[in-house]
């Protein structure tokens, strides 16, 4: 999904998937296990990195059942949520170009959302 939070001193842009239900989370993890290179390309792309530094969200301490700790994308598989997040200053929120920043961030996030929802 897409999320815009506006609050003095605490505004941010986010989205992705926040604590998805177990069947969805399992489907996302299976997708990462099968095609984690694509997810890595998305979160390392220039467009994505223009707005977001990576993915935020809680992780399991150990791999979920059925996944090897040696899997090349195990750190992504251990995630419970998949959240891009960009903090915003109050001056950014009131800037005339703010709408363009939000639209740009949401466009940069779309490939991530597409990846997360494929197969759900």
Question: What does each of the following model-derived ranges do?
Answer:
Residues 1, 23, 41-59:
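Soluble extramembrane domains of integral membrane proteins
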């Amino acid at each position: 999904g897409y999320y815009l939070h506006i609050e003095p001193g605490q505004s941010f842009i986010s989205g992705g998937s926040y604590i998805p239900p177990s069947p969805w989370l399992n489907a996302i993890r299976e997708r990462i296990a099968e095609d984690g290179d694509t997810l890595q390309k998305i979160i390392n792309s220039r467009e994505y990195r223009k707005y977001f530094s990576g993915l935020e969200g809680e992780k399991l301490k150990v791999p979920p059942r059925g996944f090897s700790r040696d899997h090349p994308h195990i750190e992504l598989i251990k995630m419970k949520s998949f959240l891009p997040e960009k903090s915003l200053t109050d001056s950014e929120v009131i800037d005339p170009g703010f709408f363009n920043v939000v639209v740009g961030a949401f466009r940069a996030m779309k490939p991530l959302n597409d990846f997360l929802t494929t197969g759900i």
